[in-house]
């Protein structure tokens, strides 16, 4: 997680939580047409009205604090079924599910894989790929997204 993303998460988490939601994660994409994506979650799901309420409050905080120079688009949404993963603690609730990983350095010769989440062991993600158990240091995870199964 970049320093800016960490700062935005720290700034926005209390706002989102005060509205009764969980801040699932924050993505900031720089450049022309910059985008700040705020993912919110709730045990009862997320509605369009929920996103609008959070967007309104987050916009106010961003206007006052001004943590991002220049113009950007704010997007507030549910993380969805194929949710991006932002923190190692989020994996615990999805043990047994598949996750698509993009790694900074190869593990067992692979930088990209879809594997089943077996466990979280401190700062290590334990996954199973083709019958082999792999220990992936979380510091090596560049991107991760749940891969829902449809039976």
From Swiss-Prot:
One Pfam family named in its UniProt record: DUF150_C
Keyword Cytoplasm applies: yes
Superkingdom of the source species: Bacteria
The keyword Cytoplasm appears for this protein: yes
One GO term of the biological process aspect: translation
Subcellular location: Cytoplasm
UniProtKB keywords: Cytoplasm, Ribosome biogenesis
Family: Belongs to the RimP family.
Function statement: Required for maturation of 30S ribosomal subunits.
Name of this protein: Ribosome maturation factor RimP
Organism per entry: Alcanivorax borkumensis (strain ATCC 700651 / DSM 11573 / NCIMB 13689 / SK2)
Gene label: rimP
């Amino acid at each position: 997680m970049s320093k800016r993303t960490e700062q935005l998460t720290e700034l926005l988490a209390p706002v989102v939580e005060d509205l009764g939601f969980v801040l699932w994660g924050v993505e900031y994409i720089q450049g022309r047409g910059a985008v700040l994506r705020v993912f919110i979650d709730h045990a009862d799901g997320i509605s369009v009205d929920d996103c609008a309420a959070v967007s309104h409050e987050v916009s106010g905080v961003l206007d006052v604090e001004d943590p991002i120079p220049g113009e950007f688009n704010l997007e507030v949404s549910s993380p969805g079924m194929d949710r991006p993963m932002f923190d190692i603690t989020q994996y615990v609730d999805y043990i047994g599910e598949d996750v698509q990983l993009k790694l900074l350095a190869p593990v067992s010769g692979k930088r990209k894989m879809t594997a089943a989440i077996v466990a979280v062991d401190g700062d290590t993600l334990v996954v199973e790929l083709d019958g082999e158990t792999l220990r992936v240091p979380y510091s090596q995870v560049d991107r991760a997204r749940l891969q829902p199964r449809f039976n």
